[in-house]
Swiss-Prot record:
Modification note: Not N-glycosylated.
Topology in the lipid bilayer: Multi-pass membrane protein
One of the GO biological process terms: GPI anchor biosynthetic process
GO cellular component, one term: mannosyltransferase complex
Name by which UniProt lists this protein: GPI alpha-1,6-mannosyltransferase 2
Domain of life of the native organism: Eukaryota
C-alpha cells in the first residue's frame, strides 16, 4: 500500500475528479449530440442487446469511437482482419482481464457491454496511476517538488484527455512508460526494461524507449571507464546494449511472428462468423485463411509496416497535402511546446547537449554548466531527446493529428516544460507558498492562504494570470473539453 504525502494525495484527488468529470461529460455529449456518420470501422453486433445493454451503450458508447472499435473488436473476436494488426495486443488483453472480473455481470450484460464497462474502469485506473507516477518521476528527475506537482496536475488536464478515457491504449501506455522511467531513475534497470517491454506490447512507439536504457548504460560506462583497461567494460557494455534492445523489441517481434502464422502459414484458418466474413467481402478486408498477402514473401515479413503503408497511407511526407492543413493546425500547439522546450534547454546547456549527456563523473567538478533544478536539470536531457525524436518522426511520417496524443502519452516533457513556465512566469504562484510538500492538511491554521490545488487557484483568478499562463491553461482546457465533444460523437478528433 502506497504511503502518499500531501502533494501525492492532491494529485490523486484531482486525477480522480477529472476522470469522473470526463466520464460524465462524454455520457452527456453522447446523449444530446447526434453521432456523425463517419467512414470508420464499424463491425456488426453479433449478440442481441437488451435494455441494460442499451443503457450501457448510451452512457459509455462515447468511449467506443474511431480506433476504439478496433480494440473492442480484437478483445471480443481476436485478430481476424489483417488491418487489426495495426493495434497491439497489450490493451485488448487488459480488457479481457477486466471482463473476467465482470464475469458475475455477464448474465445481465452482453460481451460488448462488459468490454465497455472494462474500458471505463481500466482507463480510469490507468490514467490516475499515470498521474501519480508522473509526479513521482518528476520528483526524481527534476529535483524540484513544486514543478513535479504542477506537471502532474497538468497531466490531469491533458490535451489528450479523451484518448486517456476512451477505448484507446494511451492511458495504459503512459502508466507503463512513466513507471519504467521511474524505475530506471532509481537504478533498477531490469524492472525498467521489463516495463518498457510491456509498453512496447501496448504501442509500437514503445520501441523508441529503448533509448533510455541505452543512454543510461552508456552514461554509466563513461563515468566508470578505466583508460588502462577499457576492453572488459566495453564488452560488458555491448552485451548490455544488445540485451536491452532484445528485451524491449521482443513483444514487437512476437506480435509480428503471430501475424505471420495467421496469414502466411497453411492451416491457420479459423471459424469466422458469417456476418464478419460478409463485412470483409463488402469492405475489402483481408481475413485469416484467405489469399496470402504480399508481405508474406518479404525478406523481413513485417505486417505492421505493410498495414501502415497500405491501409493508412503512412509514410515520409505523405500527409503533406493542402486538405490536411486543419490537422496540422490541431497539432501545432504541442509541436510548438516541444520545440520551445528544446530551444530553451539547448541554449541553457549547449555543452551538455553536444556531449549527449555522457560526461564522465570526475568532470562534474568542472563548471561545464550550472546546476539547475527543475526542467533545466541535466537529467532532463535524454527525455528531451526522446520528445524531440517523437515530434520529428511524427511530423514527417505519421498522420500529424496523432501528434497530440502520441506526445501527451509518451513523454513527460509536455508537462514538465509548462510546469517550468508556470513556476517562473506566473506571479500568482510565487505570491504565496504553494510548495507541494507544504500543502495544507485539514488541521492547518485558518489564516493560511496557500491553496491545495494550484490549477484551480489559477482558474479562479484567470484575469490576473500572466499571458503565458493563459496560453498554457487555455490550450490544455480547450483540447481537454473539445476532444470530448467531438471524438465521442464520431466527429474528426483522432
Amino acid at each position: 500500500m502506497w504511503s502518499l504525502d500531501p502533494s501525492q494525495k492532491e494529485v490523486l484527488r484531482f486525477a480522480v475528479s477529472c476522470r469522473i468529470l470526463t466520464l460524465m461529460l462524454q455520457a452527456l455529449f453522447n446523449i444530446i449530440i447526434p453521432d456523425h456518420h463517419a467512414d470508420a470501422f464499424s463491425p456488426p453486433r453479433l449478440a442481441s442487446s437488451c435494455s441494460v445493454d442499451q443503457l450501457v451503450e448510451g452512457l459509455l458508447g462515447g468511449l467506443s469511437r474511431w480506433d476504439a472499435e478496433h480494440f473492442l473488436f480484437i478483445a471480443e473476436h481476436g485478430y481476424l482482419y489483417e488491418h487489426n494488426f495495426a493495434f497491439f495486443p497489450g490493451f485488448p488483453l487488459a480488457l479481457l482481464m477486466g471482463t473476467e472480473l465482470l464475469r458475475p455481470l455477464q448474465g445481465l450484460l452482453s460481451q460488448r457491454s462488459c468490454l465497455l464497462v472494462s474500458v471505463a474502469l481500466l482507463n480510469f485506473l490507468f490514467s490516475v496511476l499515470a498521474a501519480v507516477t508522473l509526479h513521482d518521476l518528476g520528483c526524481l528527475v527534476l529535483g524540484c517538488p513544486r514543478q513535479a506537482f504542477y506537471a502532474a496536475m497538468l497531466f490531469c488536464l491533458s490535451p489528450a484527455n479523451v484518448f486517456l478515457a476512451a477505448g484507446y491504449s494511451e492511458a495504459l501506455f503512459a502508466f507503463l512508460t512513466f513507471s519504467a522511467m521511474g524505475q530506471l531513475e532509481r537504478g533498477r534497470s531490469w524492472a525498467s526494461g521489463l516495463l518498457f517491454a510491456l509498453a512496447t506490447g501496448v504501442r509500437s512507439n514503445g520501441l523508441v524507449s529503448v533509448g533510455f536504457l541505452l543512454h543510461a548504460q552508456c552514461r554509466g560506462f563513461f563515468s566508470s571507464l578505466v583508460v588502462l583497461n577499457p576492453l572488459k567494460p566495453l564488452f560488458k557494455l555491448m552485451a548490455s546494449l544488445c540485451l536491452s534492445v532484445l528485451t524491449v523489441s521482443l513483444p514487437f517481434a512476437l506480435f509480428q511472428y503471430y501475424a505471420y502464422t495467421q496469414f502466411c502459414l497453411p492451416g491457420s484458418a479459423h471459424s469466422v462468423p458469417e456476418p464478419l466474413v460478409q463485412l470483409a467481402v463488402d469492405k475489402g478486408y483481408r481475413i485469416t485463411g484467405g489469399n496470402e498477402p504480399p508481405w508474406c514473401s518479404w525478406g523481413l515479413p513485417l505486417v505492421y509496416s505493410y498495414i501502415q503503408d497500405v491501409y493508412w497511407n503512412v509514410g515520409f511526407l505523405r500527409y503533406y497535402e493542402l486538405r490536411q492543413v486543419p490537422n496540422f493546425l490541431l497539432a501545432t500547439p504541442v509541436a510548438v511546446l516541444v520545440v520551445w522546450a528544446a530551444w530553451t534547454y539547448v541554449t541553457t546547456h549547449p555543452w551538455l547537449c553536444l556531449t549527449l549527456g555522457l560526461r564522465r563523473s570526475k568532470d562534474s567538478k568542472k563548471t561545464l554548466e550550472k546546476p539547475h533544478p527543475g526542467f533545466l536539470s541535466p537529467k532532463v536531457f535524454v527525455y528531451l531527446v526522446h520528445a524531440a525524436g517523437l515530434l520529428l518522426f511524427g511530423s514527417l511520417c505519421m498522420h500529424v493529428q496523432v501528434l497530440t496524443r502520441l506526445l501527451c502519452s509518451s513523454t513527460p516533457v509536455v508537462y514538465w516544460f509548462p510546469a517550468h513556465l508556470l513556476q517562473n512566469q506566473e506571479p500568482l504562484l510565487r505570491s504565496v507558498d504553494t510548495v507541494p510538500e507544504k500543502l495544507l492538511e485539514k488541521n492547518s491554521p485558518p489564516g493560511q492562504k496557500a491553496p491545495r490545488n494550484c490549477i484551480m487557484k489559477l482558474l479562479y483568478n484567470w484575469r490576473a494570470c500572466s499571458p503565458v499562463t493563459r496560453c498554457i491553461l487555455g490550450y490544455f482546457l480547450t483540447y481537454w473539453l473539445l476532444g470530448l465533444l467531438l471524438h465521442c460523437n464520431f466527429l474528426p478528433w483522432t
